[in-house]
Amino acid sequence: MQIPIEVDYIIVGGGLTGCALASHLSKRLGPSASILVLEAGPDPTSNPNSTSLGGGFALAGSELDWSYKTTPISSISDRVITLNAGKALGGSSILNYGGWARGDTSDYDAWTRMLDDKRWSYNGLLPYFRGSEAFNDAGANSEQYGSNGPMKVKSISGSDPKRKYPLREPLLKAWKEIGVERVPSNAGKLAGLSEFLENFDDGVRQPSHLAYDLSGVQVKTEALVHRINFEQVPNQEPRAIGVLLADGRQIKARKEIIIAAGAVRSPQLLQLSGVGPASVISRHGIPVIYDSPAVGQNLFDHFALFQVYKLRDPERGLSLGHPSLADPAFFKGMPVDWIVNEALPADQLKKALTEDGDPSDSHGLDDASRTHVETMVVYNPLAPGVPVNGSFIATSVMLTLPTSRGSLELASASPNEPPIIRPNYFSTAVDRAVLIHGVRRLLQALTFTQAGKDVVESEMSPGPGLSSLTLESSDKDIEDRIRAIGSPHYHMAGTCALGTVLDTELRVKGVQGLRVVDASIFPAPLGGHPQASLYAIADLGAEMISMAKEAKDTN
């Protein structure tokens, strides 16, 4: 399509959140409003990998992945991590693994306390959670779950009657043996074991640009934005009036510009536009529009340890690769049944907080209902060099509420050069204590309980110099393993946070006519997996924008 010279609204970023936001906004404002989505990557629709589960693995590192590189990270043995993020229409919805998991009520309520705005509480967001999903499992509580939203959501057991993984019941029993009780999925309480929910529709991925109706929106792909243009009038805050593309073209916005470029690109674009830490911006010869020190700060992610376990008597057909699990039903989503969320015991948490110099618990982690670690068992090894022959399973032990914080800043004044990313993973005593505890709990479930020992033989060493972990392994053994091979779930967030960079209406502080709507707005981490929250936030953001227009029109 030809890029228009002027529109009402420009959305920078046609990713997971940007497409949902555009769709909601077009429906709220009607056909009289012109909305333009600018996406740096291509339209992936013709690529079959963009709609299949396995395709998500194939797309990692491809031309549809930003593949950001971090700086060497001292807290994890100076390793450089490649961060996957979708570089295409649909963004990371073309390559994520489909987990549909809200955070705990207490996670969102912590936001509310930080922001003094109940719209960001769990109950405040619940209408938008429900509005985004079509979850029609038998017996679903209509007060918690939506049934008519654009995103079809299924439980494992509800996706196909033939999709009955043989490890489902043994794992349920193993976790129960160590005191983990089953709780409803996505109903505001994470603590316990719940069935995994996913947004694969009969085995087909639902990228946001296909799940959401964009018929009332203009979309331009392969359109990288260089900066936001501002109008500066004496005694007034600068107003965002348009964008400059990397190829030199300019587009004006009559009403608002919304940045939805993700936790890396959104703060980078603000800094390129002169909004951010003045010292960083001026270093690259960019005029400072507004000194906002928090832009690019507060970076966090769900850091995790991934492991492989060897099964006992694999001829029983317990994981993928065995001929008994060849039915297409077993490939309709992630081969997993349960997610387990637990808290670090209070005495260990208190000790770690004190070690971090935070005895008053500024993160609010000691709330009785909060959980700190999520564990999953996947019936596929998912590891290089490990055969998919029915003999192995993979596991993830993931920090849900990390206290480690990183940052990012411009590497240059060019939009084509990625920013300098310093994640600072696993750098606090709390994060170390939580992950070590989570790994021990998993070892206990799989190698100590009777139900676990019946199916699992042992944890596998990931390579030379690293011994297998057992319940007898020391905390240092586990910590060394995490430092050696731990990696994030690519749930980056926090770099344009509500309360510091943004007000609670998602407006960029210090300027007019500019908002941010994506994972960078998270003021603090959430449990669960972010996409369920992001689709809700897109709906809320569209409501805020449309209400602002109505208020202005009324005046």
Give, region by region, the residue ranges found by the protein language model.
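N-terminal glycine-rich phosphate/pyrophosphate-binding loop and immediately adjacent elements
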Residues: 2-131, 289-294, 301-311, 329-330, ...
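Glycine-rich loop(s) and the adjacent beta-strand/alpha-helix scaffold that form part
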Residues: 24-36, 41-46, 228-237, 242-334, ...
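Mid-to-C-terminal "cap/lid" subdomains and adjacent gly/pro-rich loops that border
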Residues: 32-33, 277-389, 400, 429, ...
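Conserved redox-cofactor binding core of oxidoreductases
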Residues: 113-231, 237-240, 306-310
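A glycine-rich dinucleotide-binding beta-alpha-beta segment and adjacent secondary-structure elements
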Residues: 221-229, 236, 374-378, 390, ...
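Internal hydrophobic alpha-helix adjacent to the cofactor/substrate pocket in enzyme cavities
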Residues: 285-286, 440-447, 538-551
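C-terminal segments that line or cap access tunnels to active or ligand-binding sites in enzymes
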Residues: 380-383, 391-455
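A conserved FAD-binding loop/helix module that cradles the flavin
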Residues: 524-540
